[in-house]
Swiss-Prot record:
This is o-succinylbenzoate synthase. HAMAP family: MenC_1 (MF_00470). The lineage of its organism: Bacteria, Bacillati, Actinomycetota, Actinomycetes, Streptosporangiales. It is an enzyme of class 4 (lyase). CDD domains: OSBS. Converts 2-succinyl-6-hydroxy-2,4-cyclohexadiene-1-carboxylate (SHCHC) to 2-succinylbenzoate (OSB). Does not show N-succinylamino acid racemase (NSAR) activity with N-succinyl-L-phenylglycine as substrate. The gene is menC. Belongs to the mandelate racemase/muconate lactonizing enzyme family. MenC type 1 subfamily. It comes from Thermobifida fusca (strain YX). It catalyses: (1R,6R)-6-hydroxy-2-succinyl-cyclohexa-2,4-diene-1-carboxylate = 2-succinylbenzoate + H2O. The 20s loop, a flexible loop in the active site that permits ligand binding and release in most enolase superfamily proteins, has a four-amino acid deletion and is well-ordered in T.fusca OSBS.
Length: 317
């Protein structure tokens, strides 16, 4: 397999970053993406490598649907921009980032209100906190924001125990993201009755097949989301969503517009709120426009691959 590194600016700061970097790898089955965030060490990156290898060399399970419903993603922007993002998305569900650095509670309320107004009464609004609140703040803010009829609240607090306590104290469903994808034991969310919904992301979980196994073991409704990837990475998320037996919620896979560019001539963009289930091919010209020196990413990939091989050699529980 050969790899090529990329760096693509984001339109708006997202998860504290302004540029999305990674590596695209081509194998017998097609293209795979390896794009763990900068703070992740080799052991955490190992699962991202496994997902990339699966996409490039093994391919994905057969789909059970041809399209995947998706939500608009609204970063920490002002209310006017939030409304514009939703109106131009074609989606009837929106996920709104709240509790971001530099944003006040008043900013969050105004953003969620603007999204609700843009969607109308039949649209669905969910918020994503990325674990930023403590329990009491979470309970207070969820009750405050639920006047906009929240579909669910994603990762209001950082720990599983906190999620469980918040879930007991509010009526809005709770979704777990970081407590699944960054956990040594992702099933603890289920065992602690800490969530109503689980958010699964292909790269952090080690691939489509690994995520399907986790979904089956967990037994909770699943939302598939992206890790702010190019169309290559998004195609893996679409493959997971397409292979799930049930898909009760819109998925967080319409994130390509967060990037200033893509690597495909035919990018994975939603039409009328859905994404098609398909592989993508990388455009040589578009990749060349965002390509960077691969040395640092080759080193990260090699370390992740070595860590994955070590994990594979370890005895099971």
């Amino acid at each position: 397999m050969t790899g090529r590194a990329f760096a693509i600016p984001l339109r708006t700061r997202f998860r504290g970053i302004t540029v999305r970097e990674g590596m695209l790898v081509r194998g017998a089955a097609g293209w795979g993406e390896f794009s763990p965030f900068a703070e992740y060490g080799p052991r955490e990156c190992a699962r991202w490598w496994a997902a990339c290898y699966e996409a490039a060399e093994l391919g994905w399970p057969a789909p059970v649907r041809d399209t995947v419903p998706v939500n608009a993603t609204v970063p920490a922007v002002g209310p006017e921009e939030a409304a514009r993002i939703v109106a131009s998305s074609g989606c009837t569900t929106a996920k709104v980032k709240v509790a971001e650095r530099g944003q006040s509670e008043a900013n969050d309320v105004a953003r969620v209100e603007a999204v609700r107004d843009a969607l109308g009464p039949r649209g669905r609004v969910r918020i994503d906190v990325n674990g930023a609140w403590d329990v009491d703040t979470a309970v207070r803010m969820i009750r405050l924001l639920d006047r906009f009829e929240l579909e669910y609240v994603e990762q209001p607090c950082a720990t599983v125990d906190e999620l469980a306590e918040v879930r007991r104290r509010v009526s809005v469903p709770i979704a777990a993201d970081e407590s699944i994808r960054r956990a040594e034991d992702p099933l603890r969310v289920r065992d602690a009755e800490a969530a109503d919904v689980v958010v699964l992301k292909v790269q952090p979980l080690g691939g489509v097949r690994a995520a399907l196994r986790l979904a089956e073991e967990c037994g909770l409704p699943v939302v598939v989301s992206s890790a702010v990837e190019t169309s290559v990475g998004l195609a893996a998320g679409v493959a997971l969503a397409a292979a799930l037996p049930e898909l009760p919620y819109a998925c967080g896979l319409a994130t390509l517009r967060l990037l200033h560019a893509d690597v495909c001539d035919d990018p994975l963009l939603p039409v009328h709120g859905v994404l098609p289930v398909r592989r993508v091919d990388v455009s040589e010209q578009r990749l060349a426009e965002v390509e960077i020196d691969p040395a640092a990413w080759q080193a990260r990939l090699a370390a992740a691959r070595a860590a994955w091989e070590q994990v594979e050699r370890e005895p099971g529980p």
